[in-house]
Amino acid sequence: MWGDRRISELVEPVVAALGYELVGVERLSSVGKGALLRIYIDTPSGITIDDCERASHQISALLDVEELMASAYTLEISSPGLNRPLFTEEHFKRFTGVEASITLSKPLNGRREFKGLLRGIRGDRVVILVAGEEFELPLEGIKKARLVPEC
């Protein structure tokens, strides 16, 4: 899982105890506004505002006790939504056959952006079919990945 691994490892048991799946964690910073910590949760039947509020109270208390955030931050609990972020190898396996957009940290063959059909996992690489050409992208090199909603 990329994103913030330390925070993910800390909040996953809390999220699971509430009956949710931790989809992933994103830590975003904005100059002058502090950090935004976005935590995605889900269940097979989806997530409601009440679910997000319930998780927010538990996670906020935990983060304050553990003092993982060095400065002021805003905590946002969210469902993954239609353009679901993909964080783990399991996510790429689960959504094989679905269109996704992947951004790499470093270019591969001169490009960082790939949008196409997920073909699964080979070893430690995500396989994606882009305009008839298959690419194998290193899992550890993925900066951001999301499903592309169907129109």
From Swiss-Prot:
Its main location: cytoplasm. GO terms for cellular component: cytosol. It comes from the Bacteria. Keywords: Cytoplasm, Ribosome biogenesis. GO terms for biological process: ribosomal small subunit assembly; translation. SUPFAM superfamilies: YhbC-like, C-terminal domain, YhbC-like, N-terminal domain. Transmembrane segments: none annotated. The keyword Phosphoprotein does not apply. Pfam families: DUF150_C, RimP_N. Belongs to the RimP family. Required for maturation of 30S ribosomal subunits. This is Ribosome maturation factor RimP. It comes from Nitrosococcus oceani (strain ATCC 19707 / BCRC 17464 / JCM 30415 / NCIMB 11848 / C-107). The gene is rimP.
